[in-house]
Structures are given as structure tokens and as C-alpha cells.
């Protein structure tokens, strides 16, 4: 992520390409793909392997997986295939591979998200940690110089203040792992002033103070901020907001899942943004795919 978010760029996919290049410098990791029984998920795993990101371990009913590969013209001969009985079994076996240290990442195939996450958070057999599990979108928005991390738009529906602490720390850790020289977090609301009648503004103020006290680390944090004065220097100047984050945020913490999901999908479908999604807070990163995802979005 470049230092100055204020300078626009006209080059399409620039941030996406940088992310791909950075990932290709690292060794491929083993990734358990749970129930890749449709073309989209299986093709995404194959493409990610071709690009040198992962070594897929396919977990699903063997006959179905091979049939999908044959129909789609995909060569999976070099991949390990762990047979399962059904989607629930696929999720359990994929998580078991991670728990046993045989896979360093997990990917959702053609099963419901709830099925996979139930296996992830299972008390005895799952891979949860003390950290709250949350989702981040990394968005490459045309015309915006910085990649934007948006959280949480997929897992936590109406997070509490306590849960937002973990959600925020997960996003900060991700931004730093992606090489951001400075992580600048905007805690979003509909306004930039604290209003006791608007809970998200009160929580934003509390999160900022928690950061001041070292309860959240690794980033500059400001909020509440409305979306415009979080990412537009001009909008921040008009409102006379002076902070190292206003107009330059590269991480956006949304009030709830509905706001985050609409923001991320608006950027994708109206602004043509590329999106890479990841679930954090478990022992390994988890890729959740959507039926509306493009192939490039899935293997990012």
C-alpha cells in the first residue's frame, strides 16, 4: 500500500497486480479446499496453483470432484484428493487437515459458508483461537491510489464494541502483513461527530481511546468519520477535519455487516473494483468464495 492515498492513479488493477506480485514472491502453501464440487471453486484452486500461490488439497466426494474437473477441462492429476461423503464431511476433513498441520490455508468450495465455519469454530475439533474471527475485503478501486481494506462485511452481523476490537486488530495485522508502510484506520459512521443517539459514533470514540491506551496497536486510528471524509482529502478539508487519517484511510471499519457488504459490493459492481476476501482470526487464513465472484477475485 503506497504512503499517499490522496494521489489518484488511472491504471486499472494496479493494486491488484502488486498484491499478486507480492504473493508470487512467497513459497506456495498447502491449502485445503473444502467441497470443490462446482466449476468456479475448482477452477479457482487450479488457477491459484498455476500462479504459484498454493498446493491445493481437494476435499470432497472423489467421483464428483473428478467429474467436475473432466467437464471443465481441468487437470487435477497432480493434486492430493481426500474423499468425503458429503459437504459436512468435506468441511470437517478440510479443517482436520489444518489442525494436523497438513494445510496452511483453508478455502470454501461449493458448500454453505455456515457449514465450513461451523467446522472451523467447533470446540473440540475446530481451529479457532482466542481472537474473534472476522472477514476483510481488500479492494482495488480504480482511481484510488491505495488499496482499501473493508471490515467486517461477511462474518460478524452486528458486532459489539468488544468484538470490534478484535475485528479491527485483525484488519490492522492484515494491512501490515501486506506491507503497508503506515496503517490508517477510519472508523466509519454516518457522521464525524460523536452523537449519543448514534451508537456507532460512541463506539468509534471508545475504540480511538482504546488505541491511545495501547489496547489496539499497529495503526493510526480516527473516528467517527463519514466515508467521504475518510477517503477524500477535499471532503475532510471542507469539514475542517485535521488528522493523519482523514482523507487518507487505507482501512475502513464499518458499523455492521449490512453497511460493509453494501459498501464492498457497491465498489465492485458500480466502480469496477477488484476484491480479494479473507477470513482472519482462526489458526490459518480462510478464503470464502461467493457465487457472484469472478475467477480473479476468487484466486486473489
Report each predicted region and the residues it spans.
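Anion-binding alpha/beta catalytic cores of soluble intermediary-metabolism enzymes, centered on
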Residues: 1-57, 61-299
Amino acid at each position: 500500500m503506497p504512503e499517499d492515498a490522496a494521489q489518484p492513479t488511472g491504471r486499472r488493477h494496479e493494486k491488484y497486480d502488486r498484491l499478486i506480485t507480492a504473493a508470487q514472491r512467497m513459497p506456495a502453501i498447502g491449502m485445503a479446499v473444502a467441497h470443490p464440487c462446482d466449476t468456479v471453486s475448482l477452477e479457482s484452486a487450479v488457477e491459484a496453483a498455476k500462479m504459484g500461490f498454493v498446493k491445493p488439497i481437494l476435499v470432497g466426494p472423489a467421483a464428483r470432484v473428478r467429474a467436475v474437473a473432466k467437464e471443465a477441462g481441468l487437470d487435477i492429476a497432480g493434486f492430493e484428493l481426500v474423499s468425503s461423503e458429503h459437504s459436512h464431511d468435506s468441511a470437517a476433513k478440510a479443517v482436520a487437515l489444518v489442525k494436523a498441520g497438513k494445510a496452511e490455508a483453508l478455502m470454501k468450495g461449493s458448500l454453505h459458508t455456515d457449514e465450513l465455519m461451523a467446522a472451523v469454530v467447533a470446540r473440540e475439533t475446530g481451529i479457532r483461537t482466542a481472537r474473534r474471527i472476522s472477514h476483510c475485503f481488500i479492494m482495488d478501486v480504480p482511481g484510488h491510489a491505495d488499496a482499501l481494506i473493508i471490515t467486517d462485511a461477511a462474518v460478524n452481523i452486528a458486532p459489539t464494541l468488544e468484538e470490534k476490537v478484535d475485528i479491527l486488530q485483525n484488519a490492522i495485522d492484515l494491512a501490515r502483513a501486506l506491507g503497508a508502510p503506515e496503517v490508517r484506520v477510519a472508523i466509519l459512521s454516518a457522521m464525524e461527530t460523536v452523537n449519543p443517539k448514534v451508537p456507532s459514533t460512541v463506539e468509534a470514540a471508545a475504540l480511538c481511546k482504546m488505541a491511545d491506551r495501547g489496547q489496539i496497536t499497529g495503526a493510526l486510528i480516527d473516528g467517527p468519520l463519514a466515508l467521504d471524509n475518510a477517503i477524500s482529502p477535499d471532503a475532510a478539508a471542507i469539514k475542517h477535519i485535521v488528522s493523519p487519517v482523514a482523507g487518507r484511510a487505507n482501512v475502513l471499519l464499518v458499523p455492521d455487516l449490512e453497511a460493509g457488504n453494501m459498501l464492498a459490493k457497491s465498489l465492485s459492481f458500480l466502480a469496477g473494483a477488484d476484491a480479494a476476501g479473507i477470513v482472519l482470526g482462526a489458526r490459518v487464513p480462510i478464503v470464502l468464495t461467493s457465487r457472484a465472484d469472478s475467477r480473479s477475485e476468487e484466486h486473489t
